[in-house]
């Protein structure tokens, strides 16, 4: 990776060009402050993206990517970017779905180009390009109140139930307020089948813990209960990627955890851009390390429960 410099006084403060495998990525305004409270400039943000890339790239590879851009930093205005930003460099891979030309984030060159455009958050599709089947199952826990002190307790209860079903799972902070439970699976079941299974899990947990969980779709009707969003895991939808930075004032990062860590009740803000890469050097990629598993036996075992819930609709 090399740097071509213009006038020395300007190159270090206004722009630099990175040469990555023969592709050139211009980094503009590296001193622009993206996270004022954390003192993280665009230059530092891109440095941390490089360190996160061995983990973030596998989570996004081969998927339709939506980003959230904050041109003036996380305290400024933002917008969702679905169509590939233009002009799109020739090294950037894209894929079209429903008339939208999405970026497909397969390499570090593309990641740095997006980082320079102040793409802070990375939200990939829940399936691969041109492949309708999911490669994992995700249960999303969404608090109804900010700084929900019971979110890790709720995650632990979901994990315990999955374990009773014979399923291994990896919890991750969303990087905002919620927690997602990732269940690596062998491809086969459809999104519809996994949503039906999610409904069974969610209904059972709501029945057992009515003061903690809800599946009420309207937020105004949830009270203080934590919403089990089993509907989010679907074709055409996205979720915050593992290891993506988030646009919070404390520069949080969506971080996979061990179940032992969950029981110690960490806060999502404990994992941020200034410590995430160092942590990952110690833990590795907890999601990629978890072997994929066949979920068909669970679907078969709970078929009667799934059918009963379908009749209630």
Task: Please provide the spans of the model-predicted regions.
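C-terminal accessory nucleic-acid interaction domains of nucleic acid-metabolism proteins
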Residues: 1-40, 44-46, 57, 61-62, ...
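Short, flexible loop/turn elements at secondary-structure junctions
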Residues: 31, 71, 84, 143-145, ...
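Short beta-strand
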Residues: 67-71, 169-175, 216-220
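Basic, low-complexity intrinsically disordered segments
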Residues: 71-126, 130
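Signature for HUH/AEP ssDNA processing cores
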Residues: 106-174, 184-193, 310-313
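A short beta-strand motif that forms the metal-chelation/ATP-contact edge
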Residues: 179-186, 226-230
């Amino acid at each position: 990776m090399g740097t071509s410099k213009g006038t020395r006084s300007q190159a270090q403060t206004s722009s630099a060009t990175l040469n990555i495998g023969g592709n050139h990525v211009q980094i503009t305004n590296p001193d622009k402050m993206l996270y004022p409270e954390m003192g993280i400039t665009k230059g530092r943000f891109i440095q941390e993206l490089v360190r996160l890339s061995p983990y973030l790239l596998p989570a996004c590879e081969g998927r339709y990517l939506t980003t959230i851009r904050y041109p003036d930093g996380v305290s400024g205005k933002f917008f969702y970017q679905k169509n590939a930003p233009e002009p799109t460099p020739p090294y950037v891979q894209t894929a079209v779905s429903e008339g939208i030309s999405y970026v497909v984030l397969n390499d570090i060159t593309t990641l740095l180009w997006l980082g320079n455009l102040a793409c802070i958050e990375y939200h990939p599709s829940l399936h691969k390009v041109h492949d309708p089947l999911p490669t994992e199952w995700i249960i999303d826990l969404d608090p109804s109140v900010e700084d929900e002190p019971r979110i890790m307790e709720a995650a632990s209860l979901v994990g315990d139930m999955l374990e009773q079903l014979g399923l291994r799972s990896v919890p991750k902070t969303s990087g905002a307020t919620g927690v997602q439970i990732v269940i690596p699976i062998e491809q086969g079941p459809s999104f519809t089948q996994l949503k039906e299974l999610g409904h069974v899990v969610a209904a059972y947990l709501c029945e057992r813990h009515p003061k903690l969980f809800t599946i009420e779709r309207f937020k105004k009707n949830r009270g203080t209960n934590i919403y089990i969003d089993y509907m989010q895991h679907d074709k055409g939808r996205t979720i915050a990627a593992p290891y993506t930075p988030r646009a919070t004032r404390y520069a949080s990062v969506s971080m996979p955890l061990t179940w032992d860590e969950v029981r110690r009740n960490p806060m999502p803000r404990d994992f941020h851009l200034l410590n995430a890469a160092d942590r990952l050097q110690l833990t590795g990629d907890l999601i990629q390390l978890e072997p994929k598993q066949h979920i068909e036996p669970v679907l078969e075992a709970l078929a009667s429960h799934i059918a009963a819930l379908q009749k209630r609709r």
